[in-house]
């Protein structure tokens, strides 16, 4: 862990230390040579159209020189003269204040995603391997349990925001999650036979049509369904809403472009660590004495790690509130005071009406819903094959541990290239990579599922079965898709909130992340239910699911292109508001 932290610190330091401190020029633009201490909060010339770069560069240089009460130089003179060397003490101070602000954020994301991976793997094992259950229960869970729960939480969250500070809301929500997960392992699961209505479920199964059996399974294993719902909400609420909402409030657009991809370094190392922890716990089950409940013992260890990780996150949030947000070198005190005073007093109905009339929020919601529907369509089909290959909870959990580890490794590698993509190609290209990745890898998986005979020679040559080959290709598809999501889609989505006003940030983020994500998954699940009702089985519905997947991704790509234009426009407006060149021109005249 210390080595990973050191790597992140060095990467952050590299972004802060001016190139002339090492005796070489990294920047081609003369204005950029003056370093972060001069250009903090100013827009990057690389994001300005070429036709206006020269004039704007001159104004930037004059503006900064006027502030330091030095002689005004022309652009040509600025290019000819060498900048004054920056003192090592200034470099150390710049590195220190940035590490103080960004390292705790990276650690928070590490432990939040550490918990998320454990919860994600555990919830699948619980509901898929439960009595009279299977992968077909997932579409019904997401439609009839997850979506109503998400809508209810959005109403609660909106009410809490109007009554409490954002810091208190963070602690309240985190405490609720951690209390349930701790109680599930210690109280609920050991008493599951008393809590589960098995007799009533058996009676319902005796006369209801087969289409309703997944709903009966949810009723039978209602505590597992509750765990599945809250574990699923951890990703949309704690990761997307609480963490990224807080990070967006205290981070500028320029900082986000530089450091949001780097946050993924620690975040995806969390996937590796948590995956190996799940695998380690799965191995301990075999050493338990006869008569012991191996899955109950595993739950105790897994949920203990979740509660401990959540406690660390709350401690880091307290450190940010008391030591970072009160430091004027880390956060502008005027902006922080304004942020704390901001209250969202609109009712939920007014907020929903406002967001429905916002093309920006609609396009952003389309991205989130599109990802949820696309990944759900592919994932459910893959998990049905995964249960057939690993029917035992121990082997299923061990496979998911390895799956999470590989997801972390692949995402970590993709994350290293994320900043290069943002820097060279911009937000628009980065936003298109995830849907294109899902489209190509999904086509490969569905091809194997639809045309197994065509791949029979390959299966025989590899010495495996068609089932295992489908499991492995589906795993590769999910790993690449999630890697693209974590390394590019999530940073793109969070950057899109930064130029928005306070109302759109808070209510818009709540609506998009907490409702949009489950709506996407529930929408995909609802489509699967309709196809299953029409064609009888999920396997017979696969060709139509492939066509629906293509249509969803086309809509996703169109929304990303539209949002890119709006994002660039709003970012330019935000930069002009923070850096009014017109006012300087008037003073110059």
Predicted regions and their residues:
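N-terminal chloroplast transit peptides
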Residues: 1-52
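Intracellular loop-helix junctions on the cytosolic face of multi-pass helical membrane proteins
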Residues: 25-30, 75-107, 163-168, 175, ...
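Substrate-agnostic recognition of the 12-TM MFS/MFS-like secondary transporter fold
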Residues: 101-156, 205, 209-212, 219-284, ...
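A helix-boundary/kink motif common to multi-pass secondary transporters
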Residues: 164-169, 252, 286, 298, ...
């Amino acid at each position: 862990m210390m080595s990973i932290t050191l790597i992140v610190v060095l990467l952050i330091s590299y972004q802060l230390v001016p190139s002339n401190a090492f005796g070489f020029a990294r920047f081609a633009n003369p204005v950029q040579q003056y370093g972060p201490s001069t250009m903090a909060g100013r827009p990057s010339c690389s994001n300005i159209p070429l036709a206006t770069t020269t004039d704007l560069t001159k104004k930037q240089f004059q503006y900064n020189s006027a502030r330091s009460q030095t002689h005004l130089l022309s652009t040509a003179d600025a290019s000819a003269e060498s900048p004054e060397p920056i003192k090592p003490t200034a470099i150390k101070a710049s590195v220190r204040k940035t590490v103080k602000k960004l390292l705790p954020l990276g650690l928070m994301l590490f432990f939040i995603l550490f918990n998320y991976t454990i919860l994600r793997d555990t919830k699948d094992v619980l509901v898929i391997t439960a009595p009279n259950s299977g992968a077909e229960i997932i579409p019904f869970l997401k439609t009839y349990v997850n979506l109503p729960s998400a809508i209810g939480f959005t109403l609660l969250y909106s009410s809490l925001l109007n009554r409490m500070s954002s810091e208190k809301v963070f602690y309240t929500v985190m405490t609720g999650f951690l209390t349930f997960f701790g109680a599930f392992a210690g109280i609920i699961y050991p008493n599951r036979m008393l809590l589960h209505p098995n007799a009533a479920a058996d009676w319902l199964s005796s006369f209801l049509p087969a289409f309703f059996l997944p709903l009966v399974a949810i009723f039978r294993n209602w505590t597992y369904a509750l765990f599945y719902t809250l574990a699923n909400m951890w990703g949309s609420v704690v990761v997307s809403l609480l963490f990224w909402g807080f990070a967006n409030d205290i981070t500028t657009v320029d900082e986000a472009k530089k450091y949001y991809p780097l946050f993924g370094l620690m975040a995806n190392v969390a996937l590796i660590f948590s995956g190996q922890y799940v695998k380690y716990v799965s191995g301990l089950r075999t050493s338990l004495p006869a008569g012991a409940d191996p899955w109950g013992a595993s739950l105790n260890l897994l949920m203990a790690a979740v509660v401990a990780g959540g406690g660390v996150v709350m401690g880091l949030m307290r450190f940010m509130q008391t030591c970072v947000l009160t430091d004027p070198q880390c956060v502008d005190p005027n902006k922080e005071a304004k942020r704390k005073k901001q209250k969202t007093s609109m009712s939920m109905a007014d907020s929903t009406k406002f967001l429905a009339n916002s093309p920006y929020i609609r396009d952003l919601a389309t991205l989130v819903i599109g990802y949820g529907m696309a990944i759900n369509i592919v994932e459910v089909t893959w998990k049905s094959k995964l249960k057939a290959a690993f029917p035992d909870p121990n082997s299923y959990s061990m496979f998911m541990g390895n799956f999470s580890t590989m997801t972390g490794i692949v995402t970590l590698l993709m994350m290293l290239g994320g900043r290069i993509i943002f820097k060279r190609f911009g937000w628009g290209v980065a936003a298109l990579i995830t849907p294109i990745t899902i489209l190509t890898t999904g086509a490969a998986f569905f091809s194997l599922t639809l045309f197994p005979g065509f791949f029979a020679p390959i299966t025989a040559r590899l010495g495996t079965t068609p089932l295992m080959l489908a499991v492995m290709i589906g795993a590769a598809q999910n790993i690449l898709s999630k890697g693209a999501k974590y390394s590019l889609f999530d940073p793109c989505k969070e950057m899109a909130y930064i130029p928005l006003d306070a109302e759109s940030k808070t209510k818009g983020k709540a609506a998009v992340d907490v409702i949009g994500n489950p709506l996407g998954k529930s929408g995909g699940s609802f489509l699967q239910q309709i196809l299953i009702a029409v064609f009888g089985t999920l396997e017979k519905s696969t060709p139509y699911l492939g066509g629906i997947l293509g249509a969803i991704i086309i809509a996703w790509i169109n929304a990303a292109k539209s949002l890119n234009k709006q994002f660039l426009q709003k970012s330019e407006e935000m930069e002009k508001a923070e850096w009014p060149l017109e006012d300087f021109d008037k003073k110059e005249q």
